[in-house]
Amino acid sequence: MNTQTTTLDNPSADATTPNGILHAFLAAWWHGNVGEAADQFSDRFTFTDHALGLEFKDKERLTEFLAKSREFFPDTQRTDNTIFSSEDGVISEWTLTATLSEPFLGGLMRNVPIRVQGISVVQMQYGKITRWSDYYDQQTARRYGLASRFTEWTEL
């Protein structure tokens, strides 16, 4: 098992290793290439955001989620503080920062800084991501508006 600290500015990551695949996904997502980011996933995969209670098994929906995430939080920065890797997976402990613009008194808008820590558990097979699980505090992340775009409401 390897341990390291990384950011998205490491172009030397081998795209066939778990670290490289994770880096390729994050770099594509960070640069707004959500289709390229989704291409890092196998045809059969599960992406789960436990804080939001969302699960995706379809690349089209995953791509939509990644795009909306960038739209809602365009200044998002993710720093991987520690990465534990094996030959078929990665566990990444990360810090995410962003800004949320939200309504305030009298119809004004205010920018709320966000800083949240979390972990991603990523499993891979044949050079593609097969399972991705994110764990973080939903209240601190303030991503409820994003979650509402992907939850189906039912009337009582």
Regions found by a protein language model. Give the residues of each.
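C-terminal and inter-domain tail/linker signature
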Residues: 2-156
